[in-house]
Each structure stands twice: as structure tokens, then as C-alpha cells.
Amino acid sequence: MKRSVRWVLSVCVAITTLAGCSPSPQRQAVESISGADLKLHLDILAADEFRGRDTPSPELKIASRYLAVMAERYGLKPLLPDGSFLQEIPLMVTELDALRTQVSFRSSGGDREFFYLRDYGVQGRGLASARVAGRVLFLGLGLSAPDQDWDDIGALDLKDRIVVILDPDLPEGHALMTAESPRLVRRRSWTLLQRGAYAVLTVVSEAREERFREKGLQFRPARDVSLDPTGPGASAPPVSRRSTLRAEIRHDMASVLLGVSRDELSSMFSALRKGDRVPAREIRGGRLDMRIETLKRTDSTYNVVAWVEGSDEQLKNEYVLIGSHHDHLGMQEDRVFNGADDNGSGTVAMLEIAQALSIARPKRSVVMVWHTAEEKGLWGSRFFVENCPVPVAKISAQILS
């Protein structure tokens, strides 16, 4: 919280200097900033009841309206053509059709059908209908990092293969732990897909498998979110993204696909935690058939847009933009991703900045934008740029938190 207060103070000084205002009001504006107010707003927006402010969701819409109400209370004015603080963004939501989706494994030992959400979950980003069938290739950790003396792929041809990899909980100090380790699974999956794999199935960690079993949990339903090209203001088509199939599987399904016992699977995780490689191998005598079907629906979300009109008759036609995103990642099984730091802190900091700027109106106008759908592909910021309520050429600077 102390860091947030320092950041707000720094931005206020920068904005009032850039936008132009006299020292005395500037001092009063800075003194209006309250750590208690920052904490109050953050405790509300990052509470479990907001369920991680996923896009789109009722909780995110409530968060947007909360910001709009507070912006008005702190003296900001609406800037949008309809006189509101809420810039509605049309969305296209792609979801997996559980009734038509089928996943089965055929082998000499018999056929086995797996069930969506219970046995496996599909990653939402880039979700599209797909039919994938073939033999399984197991790649252990599935990491190619020659600089760290670790390469599970080598010269293997991954074209049109269904790849299975493990997601171990690597201990602190592990040779493969890096500052980006939380995204290690995603980076590995994309690397394998870029090298030609049909699909990448990641076996969940032992700790996560235990939570599934103990609490009777299921995977999070898959969905992809993009701008609805038929909606108002969304004239540009969605960004083209390659359709890919990335899924997570539980340990029972992994044991069947790999032809190993649960104990053998556990020993693989143990080896990786110790820093030992698990040999890659092709699973012969079996064929995995995955038919993924999707449904599309429209929805909406909101940017929150407000402004402080500049006090100088000429300079008020120049604009300084301040922005942060107020959406986050939602939930994963029983866990809420509260998003206090990403980006609840920036979101509430802007409220305090708004209050300060209403006390010391700068010479230039200041536009404040709380973006939405950032975590789903920067859709809120893109929509704002395409439907900017002020001339883009008149924007002097932008500060993002």
C-alpha cells in the first residue's frame, strides 16, 4: 500500500506539472490523497465476492459501475457522446459445447471415454472447434532450454502430433525456476504448437490433483473472448489468431494415455522436482480422438471513461490520458484470482488521482480510462482507441499503470 501511495503522489506531481497548475492547489491536491481511501477501494474491488472480475461477468460490470459512481463523486465529468461514464464494448464469446464435445482413447486394452470438466479442461484463449486424432507423444516437461542444459524436444518431429507434458510444482531454487516461471506452462505449450503439434495436453500438478480429489472440483469452463465485429463501434475485424488446442488433464486420464500406473506417474513428477529429466517416448498401440465443438454468443463489458476539463481556454484542448485495467482473471476451480496488484492497485490509485485533480484543475484536460478485457486480449484499450471521444492527435501524453 505504501508503494501505491508513492506511485499516486508521483503521478499527481507529473500530471499537474505536465498539464500545468499552480503550486498551492497542487499541494492541496497531493494532501487529499489518503492511504485509507486507497485501502478501502482495494478491499472492495479485490474482495472474493467480485470473483476475480473476469471478462465478461456480472461482477466486472458491478466493478465498472462502482468506478463510474466514484469518479462522479470525486468530481470527474462524463466524456462519452451519450453523457455516461460507461463505454459499452460488444463482445463475441466462444464457449465449448459440452454436449457435442467427445474425447476417447482406443487401444488394444479397450476403449475409454473421457468427460469434459471432470477429466480434462480446455484452454480458452484461441478456442475453436477442432477435430484432432492420432498417437500420443510424451515429452516429459516439454521444455527446450539448451542454455540450461535441458532439451526434451531435440530434433523430434512434432508435426501433427498430440503431445503430453507434465506440470510439476518446481521447488524454490530449482535450476529451471526463473522470474517467468508462473508462465512456464503457457510458454512451453505455445512452443510445441509452433513446432507443429496438433494439440498439447498438460498433466496437472500433484498439488492441484489433490485439490481436485479432496474437494470434488472440476476444471474451469473454457471460453474465448474477442470484439464482436457486428457490434456498435467495432468496425474492425477481430485480430486473427491461430486456432490451437491446449488442454489440461487429470492424473487418471494421464495414466491411461501414457500406459503407466498412478505410482509411476508420481515418480515422474518426483524426478522433475529433483532436476532429473523424464525421457520422451511415443505411446504405441493407442489412438486419441478429440472432437471439440464450440458455441458462440454475444455479451458486453465496459470501459469507464471520465475527464477533468482543463482550466486554460487554449490548453484545455490538449489531453493527458491516465489508464489502468480493472478486469482480472476470474477463478480457477476453488481459487479466486483477486487481482489486488494486477491491476486493482492501479485502478484505485486512479480514483485518488481523480479526487486530487478535481481539487487542482490543470490547464490541460485529463482523461481517465479504466480499461476492461485487458486480460482477454487488450480489447478494452483497442476499442477505446478505435472509438476515442477526443481527437487522438490532441493527446499529449498517456500514463498507464
PLM-predicted stretches and their roles:
Residues S181-R187, R208, L329-S401:
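Acidic/histidine-rich catalytic neighborhood of metal-dependent amide-processing enzymes
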Residues Q26, S108, D119-W150, S235-G339, ...:
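Soluble metallo-hydrolase cores and metallopeptidase-like ectodomains found primarily
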Residues C21-P78, I249, M253-V256, V260, ...:
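N-terminal hydrophobic or amphipathic helices/low-complexity stretches enriched
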Residues M1-V11:
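Bacterial N-terminal signal peptides that target proteins for export
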Residues S34, F114-P237, E309, F337:
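Extracellular/luminal Protease-associated
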Residues L9-A19:
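Bacterial N-terminal signal peptides
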Residues R51-H174, E282-R284, R291-K296, S300-N303:
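Noncatalytic luminal/extracellular "stalk/propeptide" segments of secretory-pathway proteins
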Residues D43-A46, F138, I162-L166, A199-V203, ...:
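Structural recognition of the beta-strand scaffold that forms the well-ordered cores
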